[in-house]
Amino acid sequence: MYRVIDLHCDTIPNMYSDFREGKEASLLSNSGRIDLNRMREGGYICQCFSLFTHLGALKKRGESPFTHVLGLVDFWKTQIAEYPDIIGQVTTAESMEENARMGKLSAMMTVEEGGVYEGKLENLYALYDKGVRMSTLTWNFANELGYPNPAIAPGSPRIPDMVNGLTDTGKSFVEEMERIGILIDVSHLNDAGIRDIFELTHGPVIASHSNARTLCSHLRNLSDNNIRMIGERGGVIGINYFVGFLEDGGKIGRIEKMVEHMQYIKNLAGIDAIALGSDFDGFGELCELSGAEKMQQLAAEMERQSFSSAEIDKVFSLNALRVFQSVLS
């Protein structure tokens, strides 16, 4: 069985929403696509759990993004602490490997929506101290740091935003994230912002849950140039299982298409640039990989499409582990 590191899921925000509504919310077993039982069945060693925050919804409620994300952090930590023999929080590759040796799963805390920092570096430091080790700059809203590549309707022209780059505050955040050891995640960020990140930084940059724009025209996917740049920097791209990022006009997230994106990225940037970023529990559409327990089916399709066992090991865990070792000291 191939070991799995998944760079992105939205399980915790969904559970937190249920919790706040008085519903049952358990990381051990739930109605989503990721829980501890399924992770063990699927061969996982680490799941990166995003603290996804919807700025639009918070604005309507009059709720502070930073206050909201602190609530998510507390809920996340409570869930992890409830099952100490099964899973443990990690902030380094070494602690992840130690958990694996003890037969435990690992959980890494990540941020999806740089607006939670409210433009204040002290909030970045506070979340770092709580264990955040990966962060996007945006989700689907402009914020104090930068601008997203917006969703587009089918048939709309592909016009990436090459004008509105990172704000001055965003540039300061990127430099500080690299300095203190938070993985810079360019998923959701517009092309101009990604360009700025490559100009400002020196080490690995990742896209935790993005695919190739040439194969699927959604602007959330990466241009060929950005795929190459991530590879040249020693970063990784987590393949996203959502059908809307896999193929134009698709009805179900097909495993075959996931591997086609891998093949394309391999040809542009090399096998070392590919990882997994399921986006599980961040979409409701049909997916052949219906949950974490199905992950070895992806390995079987990779074998069918002529990936070697060594290459599958890299994509499933070793490439992400290499980046963690490089950045998360």
Residue ranges and their predicted role:
Residues 15-20, 57, 146-149, 196-201, ...:
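Histidine/acidic-residue-rich catalytic or RNA/ligand-binding cores of hydrolases
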Residues 240-241, 268-292:
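Short acidic/histidine-rich active-site segments
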Residues 8, 39, 92, 131, ...:
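Conserved, mostly hydrophobic/aromatic
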Residues 290-329:
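Mid-to-C-terminal alpha-helical segments outside catalytic/metal-binding sites
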Residues 2-6, 46, 106-110, 133-134, ...:
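Structural preference for beta-strand elements that scaffold enzyme active sites
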Residues 31-33, 38-122, 140-179, 192-195:
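A metal-dependent hydrolase metal-coordination microenvironment
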Residues 19-41, 297-299:
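Short catalytic helix/loop segments, enriched in acidic residues and glycine
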Residues 119-129, 153-206, 219-233, 256-272:
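Histidine/acidic residue-rich metal-binding segments in metalloenzymes
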